[in-house]
Amino acid sequence: VYKRQGTYGRIMHVTGCYHYRGAALLAAKAAVYAGSGLVTVWSNEKVIDSLSLFCPEATSCQRHYFDEHLLQGKEAILIGSGLGLNEDSERFVCELLSHTQVPVVFDGDDLTILAKHPELLENHHSSWILTPHHGEFKRFVDFKQTSEMVDQANAFAKKYHVTLDLKGPHTLISDGNETY
């Protein structure tokens, strides 16, 4: 059966750290292989050069500055997976999140950026999925023992209207109402 490339969704993956380009490449390939119709990787030149060899099915765009037009037609955004922590990434993520209305998945360095800008959590207008490990989650809430983590995760997800996928030996997923 033949279908147009965009029939099964249009994903924007925001990344850009040369040192963690493997994370960007694996995430792009996973999105393509999971059935996303069009995967666009918004990154730096070195990541994009590697992408053309590792995952030629994905499209790409160089990330010099935020351009709202690049979000047109996108149905979901993945931020992280090789983003890198620097002033440009922080400015870029804040600008992007203030303009998007589509679901966003957060993984990696962007969680650190999000923890520094709680106002973004309080004012989002779409479905957000945060995927921190225990150390990243501690940047948002303070818990002393693992037993406190379940209650903290539920309260956090409910307060900010997000789905939390707390990764670890015993992964916890909560939307604030139900926990798995």
Residues of each region from the PLM?
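Small-residue (G/A/S/T)-rich helix-start motifs and N-terminal tracts that mark the onset
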Residues: 3-103, 112-129, 134, 138-180
